Amino acid sequence: MRTRKAKDRSRLIQAAMGQIPCDLTIGNVQFFNVITGEIYPASVDILDGFVVLVREEGQEAVLPSKSYYDGQGRYLIPGYIDTHMHIESTMMIPENLARAILPWGTTTICTDPHEIGNVMGLDGVRFMLENAKKSKLRQYVLAPSCVPSLPGMENAGAEFLAREVGELLDMDDVIGIAEIMDYVGVIHDSERMHTIIDEGLRRGMFLQGHAPYCFGRELAAYRIGGPVSDHESVNADEVRAKLRAGMHINLRASSLIDNLSFLVDGCKDQPWRDFVSVCTDDVHAKDLLTVGHINNVVRKAVASGLDGREVVKMATFNAAREYGFDDLGAIAPGYIADIQLVDALDGSRPKAVFTEGVLVAEDGKYLGGDCKTADYDLPNTVNMPQIAGPESFVLRVPEGYTGDTIRVNVMVSEDGNRILRHVEPVELPVRDGAVDISGDPTLVFVCCANRYGRGGKTIAVYRDFGHHFARQPQLHRQLPRSEGRLPRRRDPARVRRRCLRDRRRAGDAHRPAGCRPHEPEALRRGRRRDRGRAVRARCHQRRTAHPAGDRHHGAAGAAERGHYGYGPRQRRQPDVRTRVCGCGSINQPETEKG
């Protein structure tokens, strides 16, 4: 599938032959050819947003281009492609999402708007499509297949059946059916899923999968049912099984689930990995600003043992082949000029990013204009009268129950990564007619509530979900810090001491001119210990020399203080003046004698 048609193909042919000048040449680069795996010096000529020629070293241009960008010896690679993403998780509109991820090298995303579809139906999906057209980020949409996600188990703001999915598939920039989460319905050939999948198959469109813990006969039935990819593998064995079954695997690193290292273990021992690409799924705005987007997946995959060149290929060429994009994912004649310049093939932030041959980001800054507020005409859909305060999240026992404990089905995560593994019955105490989990810091309450004003909510108990969140302040004291289940309380004094320790270890590297060198901590403690001994010795001498007349050290002073002399309960503190140097560290205190 060609994602963009050239306005005038004849012009591209003429530019390739050197008969007309190109718009842009990116030169002085180390060209990474994701098709062959080679790296060699080259220059790339671009016209009308397409690559027309890759000139190897020694091949001169016939006509100079209108503009030239010096790559300064950096690697030239294609723009990253995210094979599966929910824009709603970023809390941004598509137009503003481009500002956040283009500087990180992502130039194409394939999105599933089922979250806004669950709330606003077709109107919500249309809004995402129209707003995406205003950005310089290439955004393709897949029609949500499971709205609601679990029919009969939840209430949604809309319902997508075959008719609604077919209507979406006929829209521009809709390229397939999004994650088919009802894999049970697929393998049992339910009428609802069968008719929805048929809408995509009749049009020859991409069918995206979503089938965690799927093996053997069930996996075979799911693959035959239509889906060709999966991003929900939870361990290495599942990755191997799905690759062997002919499914595309999307290595995922999201803000919610981070099990990428386990997934890499399942594919790095395979000799061929052409069916492996990458995705982010759900990523929060904070992570986009701090660690990036697809480049963060690349970084983690490299850290897990994969070769940087192969991971870049997964994030570009493999991703494009998965969707059948014939003009994306590589830098070659006839391909769209979505390009980035990077210092290394390790997921680092790009120096420059181009979409269709236009510079859109440089040095981590978006060059496409100011952030905009969407023309939002969708109604407010959040109406939750059943959530009125803390009492709304109390799990009550059945009326008339008089026992001290009650058996509760507790949901349990796998390895603390928030993937629901199983449910286990647990005896929990009852207090004031409600389940009490205060004695177990690994338990939290979770609540699922209807947000459409229809009332109703469900409260359950979850174990090991709190690895990533602090529930109550007192739990920091109850839970041993060595277990690492909850973050430590941030003590300003502790933070300052650690900063001073780090600066001392760094030596003179962070010390401004004129600042005295930091004393070793052992010497500093020794000086304080010697000072205390000297003060106690002087006190003893004064008590001996003035047993009755010294107000501060004699009997009168002792009577006034309620005990004799300066013992362990009360020590005279010298007047200390602390000097702080320009680097923020504390130099040796100076003592004024009284």
Predicted regions and their residues:
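Active-site beta-loop-alpha junctions enriched in small/polar residues
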Residues: 86-88, 114-116, 144-149, 180-183, ...
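Active-site mouth loops of central-metabolism enzymes
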Residues: 82-93, 149-162, 228
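Divalent-metal coordination cores built from histidine and acidic residues
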Residues: 2-16, 20, 98-206, 511
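Active-site microenvironment of metallo-dependent hydrolases
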Residues: 1-47, 52, 102-103, 289-305, ...
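Residue-level marker for buried hydrophobic side chains located in beta-strands
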Residues: 25, 67, 79-81, 278, ...
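Histidine/acidic residue-rich metal-binding segments in metalloenzymes
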Residues: 124, 159-179, 185-251, 257-278, ...
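Metal-associated gating/positioning segment near the N- to mid-region
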Residues: 62-131, 483
